[in-house]
Every structure is written in structure tokens, then in C-alpha cells.
Design a protein with these regions (language model features):
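Class II aminoacyl-tRNA synthetase-like tRNA-binding/catalytic domains
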Residues: 2-120, 128-132
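Generic recognition of stable, solvent-exposed alpha-helical segments in well-folded globular domains
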Residues: 21-25, 29, 138-145, 288, ...
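Generic structural hydrophobic/aromatic packing signal, biased to beta-strands
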Residues: 24-26, 30-34, 68, 78-80, ...
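A generic secondary-structure signal for well-formed alpha-helical elements
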Residues: 34-41, 150-161, 319
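A glycine-rich phosphate-binding loop feature that marks nucleotide/adenosyl-phosphate handling sites
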Residues: 47-51, 166-172, 212, 332-334
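Extended, charged alpha-beta segments that form solvent-exposed binding/catalytic grooves
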Residues: 105-199
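A translation/RNA-centric and nucleic-acid-associated enzymatic feature enriched
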Residues: 110, 181-345
Length: 345
């Protein structure tokens, strides 16, 4: 059964040639903006990592990575990355990056268990970034400051795109609104987490939802997070739990909330041990990445991922991510999309 949203009367505002040129424009301009805004150096990223080192991103903990044996390593298993959340932190240490500086990558990943729809594809491309911070920076005020700078880079890119293609009109608000996942639950107790995001994004246009990963007052999580990169359990200065979150916008083309980025201040030793215990994953303490962190071999950091195809989709006013990137889609979805003005690559 296709999960595709079919906007009534949708017609792409750019043809395929303009779309390809627009993708290039957005990717080059935003990447340069992100790099200068956060003082990030580009580094080359892996497509796969060895299994069993604890380096791959476990996402919500249930998605299966694509694996394959390596003949020259005695059929040792490699995993195609889900993201580079933990790999980047190892890279900060390897490159001896100073506080206030960081790295970014062009990350390509395969998520074979993704539920395919307008926003979700088997193929994931994002700017994965990570920056070194000091202990004094592990607070909500610092996190929100970084979010504002990323959002400013997104809005500058929107302005440039609309200047190049006057048929596209800017819609992102000037400011991004901050709200904790617990406050969302209190505001909309009868709604699901996704419905809460829709409601708050429709109200403010752009929102950073904080504290994703820990249990809320109803005993449920707003959404899942792996226990070993984002710090979702430390009590922040507002008295609430979590130093992480998602950048969401209201996307008028699909009339729904739309996640552009997941990011956060990363775990220190204390929060790593606490979160592994909370999630029943204490056995991970012996893995390579976790040992490096527990033995003070890794710097404190903040980081996240920003969807490349998603950002292009939004700024080019497309209704399906398949209008931006080449991937595999069910025949039924391709047919539905074609009938409703969405020409999938």
C-alpha cells in the first residue's frame, strides 16, 4: 500500500533541467554557508564501516544495516552506514580539531528498512557535521545558538534560490521557535507526536523540538534516539531533560511538518553510561567507540545531520523527494506520483 501524499492540483514549478541546476545551486551555496557559519572543514567520509566496532548509527535501534563480507579480511562483515554520528567524533580526535572548529562530510547512506513516502527514501544524503566544544558549552543556550546559525544559513539559501527562480516564493519565517517535547505533550495531550509537530509547526513555521529520546510524563518517548551519540538525558538549565532536538518546518506544499535536521550536544562519559543503562545496552560499553569515549580519547562535541535532498525538495517546492534524487520506488507509488504531477527521477 502506497503511503504517498498527493497534494491537490500539484504542478512542479521547475522543469527537470531547472531542477538539476537548482539542486547544484542549493548544495554548493548551503555547504559553503554551513562551513563558514560553524567553522567546519570538509573531510572525506566512508560509505561503510566494519561491523562490531560500535561506529555505525543505530538510529531507533531496530533498523537493519546493509551488510556484506570482505574477502580480503577473511569475510569480516562491513556495514553500509546509516549516518556518521559516531564516526565524526572519532575523526575530530584523529585530526586534533580545536574547540570552536569542526568537520563536515558529504554523507551517503542506505536505509533498507525505511518506510517509503514523500519524505523517506532508501537512499539518504546529508551534510553530517561535528564540532569540538568545551565543557562550559554543554548547555541549552549554546545548542540554541547553533540552531539559529544553521537556520540563518537555510534562510539565506532560500533567498538565493528564489532570486534565481522568481516563480518560487520564500515561505520560511524569520525566526525559529524553540519548544521542549514535554511542553508539546502538555499542549497537545490527545495528539500523537507527529500530530503535535504538525500543530506547532503550522503555528510558528519553523520549530526546534528539544529533548528527543528520553521518556516524557506519559512514559513514552517523543521519538527514539540511540543512546550513544545525542545527550537526551542530562537535565538542562530549563529543568527539562535533553540537550538535543530536531529542526522542523511547516511545508505548505504537503501541508505538514517537515524535518530538516536532527542534532544535539553529544554524550559525555556520564550521560553515555546513564543512557546505555536506561536503554538496556550496557554491553556496548566494551565496543571500540565507547571505550574511546570512556577513556577520555574523544573530545566533547556537538553535531548533527542536515538532509541534502530534503533541503533541495523544500527550497525547490517539490512534493516528493524522488523528484530530487534517484532511488528505487514501488511501481504503485511511481504510478500514483506520475498521475499527480510528481515526476520521479
Amino acid at each position: 500500500m502506497s503511503n504517498v501524499i498527493k497534494p491537490v492540483g500539484y504542478k512542479a514549478l521547475l522543469d527537470m533541467r531547472q531542477t538539476e541546476m537548482g539542486i547544484k545551486l542549493i548544495k554548493e551555496f548551503f555547504q559553503a554557508n554551513l562551513s563558514t557559519e560553524l567553522r567546519l572543514r570538509r573531510v572525506t567520509a566512508p560509505l561503510f564501516v566494519l561491523k562490531g566496532l560500535g561506529i555505525n548509527d543505530d538510529l531507533n535501534g531496530v533498523e537493519r544495516p546493509v551488510t556484506f563480507p570482505i574477502k580480503d579480511l577473511g569475510d569480516a562483515k562491513a556495514e553500509v552506514v546509516h549516518s556518521l554520528a559516531k564516526w565524526k567524533r572519532l575523526t575530530l580526535a584523529e585530526y586534533k580539531i580545536e574547540p570552536g572548529y569542526g568537520v563536515y562530510t558529504d554523507m551517503n547512506a542506505i536505509r533498507a528498512d525505511e518506510e517509503l513516502d514523500n519524505l523517506h527514501s532508501l537512499y539518504v544524503d546529508q551534510w553530517d557535521w561535528e564540532a569540538v566544544i568545551e565543557k562550559k558549552d554543554r548547555n541549552l543556550a549554546f545548542l540554541e545558538g547553533v540552531v539559529r546559525r544553521i537556520y540563518a544559513a537555510i534562510r539565506r539559501t532560500e533567498y538565493l534560490t528564489c532570486e534565481h527562480y522568481p516563480q518560487l516564493k520564500p515561505f520560511l519565517p524569520e525566526q525559529i521557535h524553540f519548544v521542549h517535547a514535554q511542553d508539546l505533550l502538555d499542549m497537545y495531550p490527545d495528539k500523537t507526536p507527529k500530530e503535535r509537530e504538525d500543530a506547532i509547526c503550522k503555528k510558528y513555521g519553523a520549530v526546534f523540538v528539544e529533548g528527543i529520546g528520553g521518556k516524557l510524563s506519559d512514559g513514552k518517548k517523543h521519538d527514539g534516539r540511540a543512546p550513544d551519540y545525542d545527550d537526551w538525558s542530562t537535565i538542562a538549565e530549563n529543568g527539562k531533560m535533553g540537550l538535543n532536538g530536531d529542526i522542523l518546518i511547516w511545508y505548505p506544499v504537503l501541508e505538514r511538518s517537515f524535518e530538516l535536521s536532527s542534532m544535539g550536544i553529544r554524550v559525555d562519559k556520564e550521560s553515555l553510561l546513564r543512557q546505555l543503562k536506561l536503554e538496556g545496552k550496557k554491553d556496548r560499553e566494551k565496543l571500540y567507540f565507547h571505550q574511546q569515549l570512556l577513556n577520555d580519547k574523544l573530545p566533547l562535541s556537538i553535531g548533527g545531520g542536515i538532509g541534502q535532498s530534503r533541503l533541495c525538495m523544500v527550497l525547490l517546492h517539490k512534493a516528493h523527494i524522488g523528484e530530487i534524487q534517484a532511488s528505487i520506488w514501488p511501481d504503485e507509488m511511481r504510478k500514483e506520483c506520475e498521475e499527480n504531477g510528481m515526476n520521479l527521477i
